[in-house]
């Protein structure tokens, strides 16, 4: 008789708690453990694992953990927190684990969750909750039902985490030997229900990019966390090291996270208007005006590391000036040109964020300042289609072009005065993040005798390369 092909377990797309429990309880699936994942205030993944048999209890009452051990959470005297898994975030990890005993094999799933206080209230230090709160507010106020985002995350591949030596000497669209690493990452993502659009070698030696297909903001933030994990894991399996550090190599382009975004209602893209300027609706233009008006204030969230500002300098295809255009890749925001029949693709592309940011907080502040532009009916300035790096100061003033913060110290100082950012993040996250970044600036200052410059320092390599 022909061998019966084993049915693969359902890997994603769960509707509710019962759907998840059915998948986990199915003995044929071999799902023995579930990883519960959440971000700390810096956007790094925190996790602990529970047996699949404990998942029903976790859905009912949550699972307690010590929050005092997590950056930006609570003090030791008030450390008890609870994570409640989000069933829609369930994804089966696309491999099987094996023990030393060949008879021991198991599979694991991953789930993101909401952080709660012991009394069941929402914990105000939860980055995921901050994004959900901003989504809910904008939906209630403006009536849209989806904030779609599609990030392009760039990263470097090095032989090890000890020093930033590129694993190849390729350039833009170079077809080098690490293309198969990108393909393997994509195939594993596809098995988890995560869609990609394309991959390619980026401009700098050892630099790569895989573009994710747009999704609703909360799901995309979860996907962003999984993406970074998957890239690092696949590279590790190949004896390589992947980093999302914004600027690991002096004299080369840094890594960005360009975020394509649009608002939707009832399956219709609210950013599109057939007869609007650049085919943008009034809502889209006001949204974009809000993002640009508050660009300096959100810089500390989108580019949250000392090293982030070594990327945001002239001459390396990174935005330094707050302006927008269609073909201008030196601008802060780019509006891709409209293609007839592609109304769904109408969007704006914000180019300033870096791939090591807290994605939840980054999307939260983007939506918040865009909403502020809609709420207060901001006017959009004229587009700039020339290279801003080469424009005179007089010409920059004519287009009302402002400069992004030049370093993290300036970014924190500007953010601290921003009421719209404080409201978007909530008091706890806002003040904790500012305090954390001040300590980072002080530590950097001590290591380089108080000087901020454009060169990547040894301190940054030692501090960021192993962790980002």
Each model region followed by its residue ranges:
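Glycine-rich, acidic/polar active-site loops that bind/position phosphate-bearing ligands
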Residues: 2-468
């Amino acid at each position: 008789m022909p061998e019966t092909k084993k049915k693969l377990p359902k890997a994603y797309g769960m509707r509710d708690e019962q759907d998840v429990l059915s998948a986990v309880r199915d003995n044929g699936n071999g799902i023995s453990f579930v990883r519960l994942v959440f971000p700390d205030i810096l956007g790094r993944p925190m996790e602990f694992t529970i047996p699949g048999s404990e998942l029903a209890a976790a859905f009912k009452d949550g699972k307690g953990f010590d929050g005092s051990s997590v950056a930006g959470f609570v003090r030791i005297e008030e450390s008890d927190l609870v994570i409640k898994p989000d069933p829609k975030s369930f994804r089966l990890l696309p491999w099987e684990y094996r023990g030393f005993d060949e008879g021991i094999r198991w599979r694991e799933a991953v789930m993101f969750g909401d952080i709660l206080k012991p009394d069941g209230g929402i914990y105000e230090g939860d980055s995921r909750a901050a994004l959900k709160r901003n989504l809910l507010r904008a939906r209630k106020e403006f009536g849209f039902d989806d904030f779609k985002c599609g990030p392009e995350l760039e990263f470097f591949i090095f032989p090890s985490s000890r020093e930033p030596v590129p694993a190849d000497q390729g350039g833009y669209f170079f077809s080098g030997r690490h293309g198969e690493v990108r393909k393997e990452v994509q195939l594993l993502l596809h098995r988890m229900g995560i869609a990609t659009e394309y991959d390619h070698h980026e401009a700098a030696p050892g630099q790569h990019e895989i573009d994710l297909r747009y999704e609703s903001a909360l799901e995309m933030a979860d996907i962003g966390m999984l993406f970074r994990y998957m890239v690092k894991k696949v590279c590790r399996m190949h004896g390589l090291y992947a980093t999302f550090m914004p600027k690991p190599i002096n004299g080369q382009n840094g890594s960005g996270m360009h975020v394509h975004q649009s608002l939707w209602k009832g399956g219709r893209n609210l950013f599109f208007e057939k007869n609007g300027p650049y085919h943008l609706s009034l809502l889209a233009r006001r949204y974009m005006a809000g993002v640009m008006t508050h660009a300096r204030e959100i810089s500390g969230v989108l580019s949250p590391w000392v090293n982030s500002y070594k990327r945001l300098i002239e001459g390396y295809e990174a935005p330094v000036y707050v302006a927008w255009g269609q073909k201008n890749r030196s601008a802060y925001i780019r509006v891709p040109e409209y293609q007839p029949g592609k109304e769904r693709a109408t969007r704006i592309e914000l180019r300033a964020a870096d791939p090591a940011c807290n994605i939840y907080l980054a999307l939260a502040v983007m939506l918040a300042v865009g909403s502020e532009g809609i709420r207060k009916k901001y006017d959009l300035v004229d587009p700039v289609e020339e290279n801003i790096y080469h424009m005179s100061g007089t010409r920059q003033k004519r287009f009302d072009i402002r400069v992004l913060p030049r370093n993290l110290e300036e970014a924190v100082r500007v953010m601290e005065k921003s009421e719209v950012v404080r409201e978007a993040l909530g008091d706890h996250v806002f003040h904790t993040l500012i305090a954390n970044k001040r300590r980072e600036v002080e530590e950097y200052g001590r290591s380089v005798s108080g000087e901020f410059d454009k060169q990547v320092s040894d301190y940054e390599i030692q501090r960021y390369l192993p962790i980002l």
